Curated annotation (Swiss-Prot):
Residues 38-57 are annotated as: Disordered. It comes from Homo sapiens. Signal peptide: none annotated. It is found in: Nucleus. GO terms for cellular component: cytosol; nucleoplasm. Keywords: Nucleus. This is Small nuclear protein PRAC1.
């Protein structure tokens, strides 16, 4: 969901984030439950929004 939040970058990024999210959905969910969304968010958003995901508290 963190990747989808930055879908404002354009349809190309939306497709990329969607593919990445679907591929790592289980991993992302586990990390979210473990409170590691910051690490997952940075890695995911770094390639989609140029690292803006690092602003996630």
């Amino acid at each position: 969901m963190l990747c989808a939040h930055f879908s404002d970058q354009g349809p190309a990024h939306l497709t990329t984030s969607k593919s990445a999210f679907l591929s790592n959905k289980k991993t992302s969910t586990l990390k979210h439950l473990l409170g590691e969304t910051r690490s997952d968010g940075s890695a995911c958003n770094s390639g989609i929004s140029g690292g803006r995901g690092r602003k996630i508290p």
